[in-house]
Amino acid sequence: MANTKQAQKRARQAEQRRQHNASQRSMVRTYIKRVIKAIQGGDHAQAMTEFKAAQPVIDRIADKDAISKKKAARIKSRLNKRIKALAA
């Protein structure tokens, strides 16, 4: 437990950031699921539309450090690879 006033404030701020970041990561997972669902449905056009919507969201969350930039790149790369395989 934080003993000083400053430590108590830092604990509050850390908890607020944790909750906000959890919400942001959840949003990213939702966008990823939409793309995967479109891929599994076999609809290339829908998959591309969902992917184009997901890309800026993933990048924005990575810029805010809720997820790492490398993880964001890995996610986008894997989704794009699956979409290309669907088109072939």
UniProtKB/Swiss-Prot annotation:
Keyword RNA-binding listed: yes
Pfam assignment, any one: Ribosomal_S20p
One GO term of the biological process aspect: translation
Keyword Manganese appears in the UniProt entry: no
One GO cellular component term noted in the UniProt record for this chain: small ribosomal subunit
Gene3D superfamilies: Ribosomal protein S20
Keywords noted in UniProt: Ribonucleoprotein, Ribosomal protein, RNA-binding, rRNA-binding
A GO molecular-function descriptor: structural constituent of ribosome
Disordered as annotated region, ranges: 1-27
PANTHER family: 30S RIBOSOMAL PROTEIN S20 (PTHR33398), SMALL RIBOSOMAL SUBUNIT PROTEIN BS20C (PTHR33398:SF1)
Functional note: Binds directly to 16S ribosomal RNA.
Protein family (similarity comment): Belongs to the bacterial ribosomal protein bS20 family.
Family annotation (HAMAP family): Ribosomal_bS20
Name of the protein described by the UniProt record: Small ribosomal subunit protein bS20
Gene name as annotated: rpsT
